UniProtKB/Swiss-Prot annotation:
Pfam families: PsiE. The keyword Transmembrane helix applies. It comes from Edwardsiella ictaluri (strain 93-146). This is Protein PsiE homolog. GO terms for biological process: cellular response to phosphate starvation. HAMAP family: PsiE (MF_01048). It is found in: Cell inner membrane. GO terms for cellular component: plasma membrane. Keywords: Cell inner membrane, Cell membrane, Membrane, Transmembrane, Transmembrane helix. It comes from the Bacteria. It is a multi-pass membrane protein. The chain crosses the membrane at residues 13-33, 54-74, 82-102, 107-127.
Length: 135
């Protein structure tokens, strides 16, 4: 079956391209993670205490976002070249928490963001049930 062989070769080439792209993305994320580490250290020793605390909390949440994306890429390679849904939900929850920390001027927006977190937590619970769990 020459058509099947050709399709397998195309799939293999595309998988290699995807893997190389993800490794490049992981390297970039590690660089940003190191940069964020230095930024957090600078904010930690800043003399302006009020702005420093706010920036430190925001920086820590950004740090966790980088960390979660790197963990997602690692999990992709460990789990047979697929992205587990749970990790995307974790990233979504962390991103919305960061948004609440950064933009908390409107109570209505904060309530909507909190509802979105609740929906994601319910989705995470459903994704971790035995019927949907892959790992």
């Amino acid at each position: 079956m020459p058509g099947t062989e050709r399709a397998n070769r195309v799939a293999t080439v595309l998988q290699w391209i995807l893997n190389i792209g993800l490794m490049a993305l992981a390297a970039i994320l590690v660089i940003f993670l190191a940069k964020e580490t230095f930024t957090l250290a600078g904010v930690l020793f800043d003399a302006n205490q009020n702005a420093s605390t706010y920036m430190l909390v925001e920086g820590i949440v950004i740090y966790f976002l980088y960390f979660e994306f790197i963990a997602l890429i690692v999990k992709y390679f460990q789990s047979g070249y697929h992205f587990p849904l749970r990790y995307f939900i974790y990233i979504g929850i962390t991103a919305i928490i960061r948004l609440i920390i950064v933009d908390h001027e409107s109570p209505n927006d904060t309530l909507i963001y909190s509802f979105a977190i609740l929906v994601l937590v319910i989705a995470l619970y459903l994704a971790n049930t035995d019927r949907l769990k892959r790992e």
